[in-house]
Amino acid sequence: MEAVAEHDFQAGSPDELSFKRGNTLKVLNKDEDPHWYKAELDGNEGFIPSNYIRMTECNWYLGKITRNDAEVLLKKPTVRDGHFLVRQCESSPGEFSISVRFQDSVQHFKVLRDQNGKYYLWAVKFNSLNELVAYHRTASVSRTHTILLSDMNVETKFVQALFDFNPQESGELAFKRGDVITLINKDDPNWWEGQLNNRRGIFPSNYVCPYNSNKSNSNVAPGFNFGN
């Protein structure tokens, strides 16, 4: 993902990254701590304060959602061929995968990086995930089928836990404050159904809030995750 610096920042420790207002940074990880993101600028990596930058819109990035949960979301009846999401790669932390709906199934493509930090799936390389996604809206992500990326509305598909929830009955879904839950059913206004870490169950609707992938939720604790 990309972000634009809104203020100058001078690193205060070796693991932080300095930048100037107006710089465009590659955000490598924003899921471990909502206050400090891991980013790259001019080949250098380090942590940056999230309130010094403005994220470029990317509703397609869902962070630490598992491969299985990605498939649950993308196999819903309202999802069409080409609808996709980008997530952190389970087998290689810090790297990314693209999950795409195609012909009643979901295909997964690992995003590769070369020694210069450029992103690619096949031959064409890009400076950022944003550029890679934009390119594959008109050029297939697959070499065997024509699969063009297109957006789906994910904001209503996920909720984020405001509090810990410990089940009292069988069939309820346990979660921790900050967890992001795949929303399956909310026909009952008080008890919704969701999935987290390959577990499925119901939970109280007043324990969660809508999840926005582009903003850190100030109501939740640092270290929230997508159930990876």
Swiss-Prot record:
Please give the biological process terms from Gene Ontology that the record holds.
epidermal growth factor receptor signaling pathway; male genitalia development; muscle organ development; regulation of cell migration; regulation of cell projection organization; regulation of MAPK cascade; regulation of nematode larval development; regulation of vulval development
Provide the SH2 domain boundaries. 60-152
Could you tell me which PROSITE patterns the record lists for this protein? SH2, SH3
Q: Does Repeat show up as a keyword for this record?
A: yes
| Annotated compartments | Cell membrane
Q: Which cysteines are joined by disulfide bonds?
A: none
Pfam families assigned to the protein according to its UniProt record, in alphabetical order: SH2, SH3_1
Domain (SH3): residue spans on this chain? 1-58, 154-213
- Coarse class of the protein's main subcellular location: membrane
Cell membrane: present as a keyword of the record? Answer: yes
Q: Which CDD domains did the record assign?
A: SH2_Grb2_like, SH3_GRB2_like_C, SH3_GRB2_like_N
Q: Mind listing the UniProt keywords for this protein, alphabetically?
A: Cell membrane, Membrane, Repeat, SH2 domain, SH3 domain
Upon gene disruption, the observed phenotype is: RNAi-mediated knockdown or RNAi-mediated knockdown in body wall muscles causes ectopic membrane extensions from body wall muscles.
Note the superkingdom of the native organism: Eukaryota
The record's section on Gene3D superfamilies has: SH2 domain, SH3 Domains
UniProt tissue specificity: Expressed in body wall muscles, pharynx, intestine and hypodermis.
State whether it acts alone or in a complex, and with which partners, per the record.
Interacts (probably via SH3 domain 2) with soc-1 (via C-terminus). Interacts with mig-2 (active GTP-bound form) and wsp-1. Interacts with mig-13; the interaction is direct.
Q: What does this protein do?
A: Adapter protein which modulates signaling mediated by several receptor tyrosine kinases such as egl-15 and let-23 probably acting upstream of let-60/ras. Negatively regulates vulva induction probably downstream of let-23. Involved in sex myoblast migration. Negatively regulates fluid homeostasis probably downstream of egl-15. During the formation of neuromuscular junctions at the larval stage, negatively regulates membrane protrusion from body wall muscles probably downstream of egl-15.
Cited PANTHER family: PROTEIN ENHANCER OF SEVENLESS 2B
Family according to the record? Belongs to the GRB2/sem-5/DRK family.
How is this protein named in the record?
Sex muscle abnormal protein 5
